[in-house]
């Protein structure tokens, strides 16, 4: 392992001890916000510190075994050879583990996310597929014990959605769902197709991380145009009697957000502002990424949200992810929410990219 990496690990070990000492300080304990922040930092350091301590112990074991090789006793030398072999194997495994633990982490991976699904080319069939995608993501969220809250929905006449926006809350939501941003294409025979011809339709999926209130970018109220209107869709007679739905236009960027799922205008406004902040932050994040990543490709579809990332071919029961040339003949399971079969290889590929970039530094 490079000495620069060892130095970084030693610094993290030292920081871990500092944080542990501070967590036992009465002044820190009385300051809830600081105590919470330090507890989070300690938790984040835990895995890398544990692995580095094991690495240091394995290095000591190797040195001890090398000393034993100088013994006159043949049996002791044989034992030393076995111990050296075992220590080297542990060191090799821990080096790989520590390299991964040191990879730069997306600070937004642990945040909640806004999932937006929009029907694209394909008319009614695209809207029906948007409904299928929403069902797929709902099942995936359910399996992960994540909460799904509908923010805004525009239903299509023949089923499915022209657009649906939901907030997904839970542990590590954005870290997994962010890989879903991009164009999703479906190839299948629509129920309305009498000739049995395969049609191609498309939907766009956008995943934005929620911006915590404390970190929310400042939005000038003067830059906002707020309209109220009567909500449409399900909800009984109430939706036809009050102007509870909200449409907010951010004039400088042209971003428009609508929320009408809540019965209260106040709640709809709060949700709309939340989505607006996430979209504006996404633009800022993309500007920063573009500046930082001039050469390294990113697996997370970012600026070009129309970029096709996946094709769902129903006649062949096939799902293809075009970013990593992965094809799986498990369409039924995937549409039932088994997204890990797709996400895990993508995340490993992304990890490999980061490791390659780290090696070049």
Swiss-Prot record:
It is found in: Cytoplasm. Methylated by PrmC. Methylation increases the termination efficiency of RF1. InterPro entries: PCRF (IPR005139), Pep_chain_release_fac_I (IPR000352), Pep_chain_release_fac_I_sf (IPR045853), Prokaryotic/Mito_RF (IPR050057), RF-1 (IPR004373). PROSITE patterns: RF_PROK_I. Its main location: cytoplasm. The keyword Transmembrane does not apply. Peptide chain release factor 1 directs the termination of translation in response to the peptide chain termination codons UAG and UAA. Belongs to the prokaryotic/mitochondrial release factor family. This is Peptide chain release factor 1. It comes from Shewanella denitrificans (strain OS217 / ATCC BAA-1090 / DSM 15013).
